[in-house]
């Protein structure tokens, strides 16, 4: 195909047997997903050059056409229910995502509750252990008093049962107040410290994942090949081919066709974000 350019480029290479896939650009045709070859546009669109598969040609508008290929219209009556179903599907997906978020929140609350329960159980065990230790100390003091009383030691400070009960009650109240203070502090620390620890943990995980993704992107960019357009090339189908201007820098995305075989048509991406297929003999590889 001849192009409007000052310097005529080499002859275009032939398309591979496996074909090439259409690329979705912003200025591509709406039916480009159907075409995998530039000539397919003449099949899908019967008004291509106003000469589709019309046996009476497109120059005579008084003779009806017998084109078996019906053009793709977007305003057909059947597209209304399809769009409604798509809207319903998107709503159902949004509700499902909200349900997943609520479920994860409930699981986090349940885990926090289990953590508080385990902390309270450990505090009760600690209380029992401390009580046992104080009981042993009290028993030893009683044995000491009995031994001293048995040997009639002069420095015995005898205590009647009433005074001992009052002392034991005061000591028990003091222990209970200490236990209540410790329990309150543990609950406050759990309510404040546990969410902070979880947030810090997730933040560290997010930072590590971000660094890994950046390293992968950097590695992928380093492995890309770049080429420079030596000739101008006008695309024959915006849905498949990509236009080139002399001096354009293109990142090579693929050098194979749809079947994985090497071909002379390469898939690339320009700095503007446009992607498509272009002839390899119109460009030269940039050496690093």
UniProtKB/Swiss-Prot annotation:
**Coiled coil stretches, renumbered:** none
Q: Which keywords label this protein? A: Membrane, Peroxisome, Protein transport, SH3 domain, Translocation, Transmembrane, Transmembrane helix, Transport
Any one GO CC term of the record: cytoplasm
Keyword Protein transport found: yes
Q: Where is this region: Disordered?
A: 1-32
What is the gene called? pex13
Q: Quote the subunit structure annotation.
A: Interacts (via SH3 domain) with PEX14 (via SH3-binding motif); forming the PEX13-PEX14 docking complex.
Where's the SH3 domain?
222-288
Family according to the record = Belongs to the peroxin-13 family.
The protein in question is named Peroxisomal membrane protein pex13
Biological function: Component of the PEX13-PEX14 docking complex, a translocon channel that specifically mediates the import of peroxisomal cargo proteins bound to PEX5 receptor. The PEX13-PEX14 docking complex forms a large import pore which can be opened to a diameter of about 9 nm. Mechanistically, PEX5 receptor along with cargo proteins associates with the PEX14 subunit of the PEX13-PEX14 docking complex in the cytosol, leading to the insertion of the receptor into the organelle membrane with the concomitant translocation of the cargo into the peroxisome matrix.
SUPFAM superfamilies attached to this UniProt entry: SH3-domain
- Where are stretches of biased composition, namely Polar residues? 22-32
So which domain of life are we looking at? Eukaryota
Bilayer-crossing regions:
178-198
């Amino acid at each position: 195909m001849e192009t409007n350019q000052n310097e005529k480029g080499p002859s275009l290479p032939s398309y591979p047997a496996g074909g090439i896939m259409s690329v979705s650009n912003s200025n591509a045709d709406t039916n480009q997903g159907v075409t995998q070859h530039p000539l397919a546009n003449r099949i899908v669109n019967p008004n291509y050059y106003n000469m589709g598969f019309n046996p009476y040609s497109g120059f005579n508008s008084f003779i009806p056409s017998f084109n078996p290929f019906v053009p793709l219209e977007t305003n057909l009556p059947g597209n209304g229910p399809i769009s409604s179903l798509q809207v319903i599907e998107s709503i159902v997906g949004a509700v499902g995502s909200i349900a997943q978020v609520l479920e994860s929140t409930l699981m986090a609350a349940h885990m926090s509750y289990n953590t508080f329960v385990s902390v309270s159980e450990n505090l009760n065990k600690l209380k029992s252990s401390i009580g046992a230790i104080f009981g042993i100390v009290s028993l030893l003091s009683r044995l000491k008093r009995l031994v001293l009383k048995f040997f009639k030691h002069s420095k015995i400070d005898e205590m009647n049962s009433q005074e001992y009960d009052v002392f034991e009650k005061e000591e028990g109240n003091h222990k209970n107040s200490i236990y209540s203070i410790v329990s309150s502090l543990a609950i406050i620390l759990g309510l404040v410290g546990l969410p902070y620890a979880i947030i810090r943990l997730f933040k560290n995980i997010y930072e590590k994942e971000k660094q890994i993704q950046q390293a992968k992107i950097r590695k992928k960019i380093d492995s890309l090949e770049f080429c420079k357009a030596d000739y101008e090339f006008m695309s024959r189908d915006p849905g498949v081919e990509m236009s080139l201007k002399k001096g354009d820098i293109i990142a090579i995305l693929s050098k194979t066709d749809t079947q994985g075989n090497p071909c002379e048509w390469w898939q690339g991406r320009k700095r503007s974000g446009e992607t498509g297929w272009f002839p390899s003999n119109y460009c030269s590889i940039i050496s690093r």
